[in-house]
Structure formats: C-alpha cells, structure tokens
Amino acid sequence: MRRLLDFLRRGLIRPDPRHAQGKRAEAQGLRLLRAQGLRLLARNARNRHGELDLIMLDGEVLVVVEVRWRSGSAFGGAAASIGPAKQARLARAAACWLAGSEHAGRRLRFDVLAFEAGQARWLRGAFEPPAYIASQALRARGRRR
C-alpha cells in the first residue's frame, strides 16, 4: 500500500483535468455565494450516502448547494445533469448530515450553481427536499428543545 501511495504522490498518474476544473468552479461558486451573504458551514461533506459540495446558511435557511461545471450546453447543460436519481442521493446525504448537526431544525433548501461556458447560474430552490427530510428536521428540532 505504501508503494502505491508513493507512486501517486510522485505524480506519475496525471489527475483528470475535469476534476481540477470542477474544483475551480466550486471555489468560484463559494466566492460568489459568500458575496451574496451566504455563510459556509461545510465543504465537500461526505457520508455513506454521498458528498455535498457546499452546505451554507442563507439567513436562517440551511442551503445544500450542488456545483456543476460543463464546458458547453450539450446534453442539456450543467443544471440538467442533476436528474431525479442525483436529487435523491443529495437528499439522502443531506438527511444523514442533518441527523448529526446542530442545524437539524432549520428549513432546508437545495440550490444548484451551474457553470457553463464561463457563466454562472444560481438556481435557488432548484428542487424540493423529499417529505421525509422535512419530517426528520422537525423531529430533530423537537428533540433539541
């Protein structure tokens, strides 16, 4: 295992340039959202259900932001790449994150920050969280009082 890690550290395996571009878009998106007054709580929060790019506060609302980057609008573009299956994974990951968070009682919103051809598009409330997440948040609020 140590050899493999040494091999990777030396840079003999080239990183995927799309991954680097996605990270740049995420950093740019974070700056944009902070400029709009949102406060960062977590970045790249991972759990058994997946990864949440950005978890932020917009006033009293907890916002889960999925950042997507595409070089063009082929195949529907960046925002269209977040279909029902991805939305469900994000919702499950958010529910898991909320379960262990002091923010469990807050209202939840899912936003998408889509970058296409250098342009950013912020879709507030891009999709509704499933009812089970809302009910988990309310139950957690009751337990914390």
UniProtKB/Swiss-Prot annotation:
Transmembrane segments: none annotated. GO terms for molecular function: nucleic acid binding. It holds the Pfam family UPF0102. Belongs to the UPF0102 family. This is UPF0102 protein BAV3162.
